[in-house]
Amino acid sequence: MKGVAYLKLIIAEKPSVAKSIASALGASSRADGFYEGSGLLVSWCVGHLVSPMDAGGYDERFKKWRYDDLPILPEPFRYVLAPGKEDAFENLCALMNRPDVDIIVNACDAGREGELIFRLVYEMAGCRKPVLRLWISSMEDSAIREGFSDLRPGADYEALYQSALCRQKADWLVGINATRLFSVLYHRTLNVGRVQTPTLAMLADRDAKITLFHKEKYHLLRLTLDGAEAVSEKFTDPAEAEQASAMCKGSAVTCTSVTKEQKKEQPPKLYDLTTLQREANRLFGYTAKQTLDYAQSLYEKKLLTYPRTDSRYLTSDMAETVSCVIHLTAKLPPFDSCTDFFPLVETMVSDKDVSDHHAIIPTMEIEKADIKGLPLGERNLFLLVCCKLLCASAEPYVYETVTATFDCCGHSFTAKGKRVISEGWREIDRIFRAFLKEKPADGDGDTLPDFTGGQTFDGAEVVVTEHFTQPPKPYTEDTLLSAMENAGKDGIPDEAERKGLGTPATRAVIIEKLVAAGFVERRGKSLIPTKAGINLVTVLPEPLTSPMLTAEWEQELTEIAKGSTDPDTFMDGIRTMVQEIVSTYSCISEDGKKLFAPEKKVIGTCPRCGQPVYEGKNNFACSDRSCGFVLWKNDRFWTSRKKELTKKMAADLLKKGRTNVKGMWSEKKQATYDAAVILNDTGGRYINFKLEFPKRKVGADGRK
């Protein structure tokens, strides 16, 4: 239109990000649902505004869960507005369709889910205006401005969008069909997920190994020489250990060899999200979700770079900026007590190992940030990332290992020691752990005396110690995240970009879903599968529990995002698998049905047949269905008196045939009263009750 000043509409994923973008780009005027200024409108989604339609939306009959309606395979998929987010969508829709807006800028999170969030809103709004993509790894003003000066065509991310769609559709197809199928078969809601179920299978497998573990006893001989300790090989027979000890005590000992080897331990890599979550769990006990939430908050506060990354390297164009960040970080307590060092930035740089986002590091904003004012969780995580940056840029840790072997009466003993030559990056790690009051990550070991080959010792001191083999340890979030990341590793080529269950951005959600569904429980730092979780893994088919298969799917999604795999081929494979599972599992055995039956507690004995009576959701019923004896909690007898039959009242009725009830309501008198309720079972379909009122005491005048 002639004379119209056209605007760019920038859409962020959440209000806080939109505010930062608006501030950085000069859109300083706040309106209802957007910021405006400098030729820009800046608005926001509130997470996912558009989501796949529920099964019931495709057909009324799908509102009920029935085996005969499976599988449900919608084509095409339809989408609806997320409940409660209609206003946010209408605001964006109105802005996108404004005649003075000529370009839409997708500024949602720079990743698979961020792409999906924007695209679904764009499609549902019916917008056809050109799209540009803001792709940044930091919320610093300088990074936002630099990213905005280098906007990319939205079409460049079409493959990423297709990958996101395939992920969403696959989760819907597997989740809806498998959950309904096994819930109907086992008469209990059993939530099945494309990624969460194989994760549960790993937990169940570890639990089984712990349960079946048989500990074995063994013994060691410990020889003391000049204050150092040398240890024998294992003895499985205690008699042999005692015999060897008796032979060695007081005997001569000869040093048969001394081996010294200088070793170098390179600095650790920077954090990606998974390694950050793992270490935060080890050091602070934070769950994966807590760590992600803290990291996201620090990102939005401009103190950390983008957290949902799977790279542990930086790009070459960042070298100068990172060097400045390192020097700023080194001034922060407790790192300001470290020995001066010159950062080796080149060790952290690898362009080929950075795809969407580089490793997580602090930003230049730390120079003016109030670190002490951060909430404790965020402060701990921020300092952890700072520590890793300093360690990664420091000198290697250099040490010498010493291994001395000894002979005593034909038995071999070994002593090991270590001597630090240059502490390097471990100095920073040690200082940080001392600040946290944590032990060093790896003890330096004892320094051995200067043993020499051929050296002899008289009067050996020997003791026998008893030990047991140890079972595998339960998974913690640290070790489970590692297992998820490496699942299927052996079956995927080394050059593959992603191996494992889920992505760094989704693994925390998967763990939380398993806990919320009652399939996993937290015991301290350990994640333990519940009985229901173990049973679920037992009854599900291999395609739904195989970490290898699911890891292969995740790899295919990565290939789709790169444009090297056809999305339709992937989805055809998912649909075929769902159809095969539904057709294979049409019924289960009677024993199978009992797997998920709630554990019932006997509250009494049936007065008709003598069998146990159990509490159900709405009643107390005889365990023999043919008997028919049932006490309903909301029988009209009770509801008319504004009461509900409780477990104690039912137990009294079964044991004594009566129960005393206070505060029953009389509609006629509009008042409450107390009475004994008598069980009056005539053997019919319904149980009857009678009331017995307490006898009144006779007064002095003869009246009651």
Where are these regions (language model features)?
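Basic, low-complexity terminal or inter-domain segments flanking catalytic cores
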Residues: 3-9, 31, 85, 96, ...
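Amphipathic alpha-helical transducer elements in NTP-driven molecular machines
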Residues: 15-22, 39-42, 46, 82-93, ...
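Short strand-coil-strand connectors
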Residues: 36-38, 224-228, 407-411, 669
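Metal- or metallocofactor-binding catalytic centers and their adjacent structured scaffolds
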Residues: 239-271, 277
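C-terminal or mid-to-C-terminal helical accessory/interaction module adjacent to the motor/catalytic core
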Residues: 77, 99, 141-225, 260-264
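Conserved short loop/turn motifs at secondary-structure junctions
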Residues: 6-7, 105-110, 187-189, 260-269, ...
